[in-house]
Amino acid sequence: MRDIYELTPSMRLLLTMHNISAVSTESAKRLDDLRCFSDLKNHELREALRELLSHGYVVEREGAYYLSSLGISVVRSVYT
């Protein structure tokens, strides 16, 4: 049985990116950095990024990733 409080890989990545302040082009993180900071397996990380990009929660620029304003709003909604 799954823990009802278990977060999806995409939500875990979203929260991790916020926690490491990947919130602008200047603080964007490369895939290797995200892999180090998250506890996600490689395939989970890539799938989570694909999902977050498709929803507009994450922006990719020159191989680095950061949260969009929408992604930041989603994280903030978790804490309020």
Task: Give residue ranges: language-model regions.
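Minor-groove-contacting beta-hairpin "wing" of winged helix-turn-helix DNA-binding domains
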Residues: 64-69
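Short alpha-helical segments that sit at the start of domains
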Residues: 1-23
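Short Asp/Glu-rich motifs
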Residues: 54, 71-72
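Short, amphipathic alpha-helical interaction segments positioned at domain boundaries
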Residues: 72-80
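A short, conserved structural fragment
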Residues: 53-63
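Short acidic, hydrophobic short linear motifs in intrinsically disordered regions
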Residues: 23-37
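Short amphipathic alpha-helical interaction segments
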Residues: 39-54
